[in-house]
């Protein structure tokens, strides 16, 4: 049985994940002693992520980070910790976004024209971070894939 600790279990994604874990006969939700977990999933607030990285590093626990809006210092800490523990950092874990990213990479690599990009997103009224981590991740993907400098600008419109 895989033991999972969910950091940020009271948020939208955390609640969804804990419900799925509780329904599974192959997964066990760890709620108190994080050191007993086989993996930690972080859907918390950016302020909490740094501490969970340190705890996972100290206890040699693999970490999945779905928290967005992380600062530069946290990204540096993630890179350091990834030398000692497995870390998956993903702003959006949906299959649809994965397929979108793959399509964007294929398009950017094959494109020969100069283009401008607009990433437009609409959210529910309770959305905490704007632009979303997904939009920022897509912008970074385009920028890092554009080896021929065909993308003039990339804008994000978030409502």
Give the ranges of each region predicted by the language model:
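Rossmann-fold NAD(P)-binding glycine/threonine-rich loop
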Residues: 47, 53-54, 67-89, 95-107
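Residue-level signal for alpha-helix termini/capping positions
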Residues: 57, 109-112
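A general structural motif
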Residues: 1, 36-37, 60, 84, ...
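Rossmann-like NAD(P)-binding element
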Residues: 34-51, 57, 61-64
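Glycine- and other small-residue-rich loops at beta-strand/loop junctions that grip anionic moieties
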Residues: 41, 66-68, 92, 127, ...
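Short, conserved beta-strand edge motifs with alternating hydrophobic and charged residues
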Residues: 66, 90, 118-122
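C-terminal substrate-binding/catalytic lobe of Rossmann-fold NAD(P)-dependent oxidoreductases
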Residues: 3-34, 113-159
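Electropositive phosphate-/nucleotide-binding environments in soluble metabolic enzymes
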Residues: 7, 11, 15, 43-46, ...
């Amino acid at each position: 049985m895989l033991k999972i600790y969910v950091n940020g279990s009271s948020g939208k994604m955390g609640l969804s994940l804990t419900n799925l874990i509780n329904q599974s006969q192959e997964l066990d939700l760890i709620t108190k002693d994080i050191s007993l977990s086989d993996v930690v999933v972080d859907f918390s607030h950016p302020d909490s992520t740094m501490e969970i990285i340190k705890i996972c590093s100290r206890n040699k626990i693999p970490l999945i980070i779905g928290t967005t809006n992380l600062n530069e210092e946290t990204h540096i800490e993630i890179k350091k910790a990834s030398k000692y523990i497995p870390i998956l950092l993903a702003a959006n874990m949906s299959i649809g976004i994965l397929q979108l990213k793959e399509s964007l990479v294929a398009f950017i690599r094959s494109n020969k024209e100069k283009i401008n990009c607009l990433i437009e997103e609409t959210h529910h009224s309770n959305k905490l971070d704007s632009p979303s981590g997904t939009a920022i991740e897509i912008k970074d993907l385009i920028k890092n894939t554009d080896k021929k400098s065909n993308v003039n600008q990339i804008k994000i419109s978030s409502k």
